[in-house]
């Protein structure tokens, strides 16, 4: 199953989490805005690459672009960002399950990116995001490994 992650979904989640943190925290925190998107996109690539390494053995192919074109101001997230992955043991997933896996990958990139960005300014928030990313990664790994086992156990009729 090949998935193209949606950069806008990732940045929307980053901005939403940042806004919710500012709105609900007793402490004052700086809001992440679209002005920081060029830097965030660099970190998004880094986090995506980390995920691909962490999923080694479960990834068939991956594709990542190397850089953004020269940003125009005001900067927006409509400039394509290539974050593609082909997952092993996933061809039998229903369309709904494929969308769920895609959304979880986008969530892991968003949580990892914002967690990385918040490390110095809000260590508790950063740890919380990293813990959520790790939990989602573990769940995805388990899902792909269980599906591989189910595929291996199916009887074959090659006659």
Predicted stretch roles:
Residues 1-98, 139-159:
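Conserved short "hinge" loops at termini or chain/domain junctions
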Residues 116, 121-122, 138:
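Mixed-charge, glycine-accented linear interaction segment located at domain edges/termini
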Residues 122-132:
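Short conserved catalytic/interaction loops centered on acidic-Pro-aromatic/His motifs
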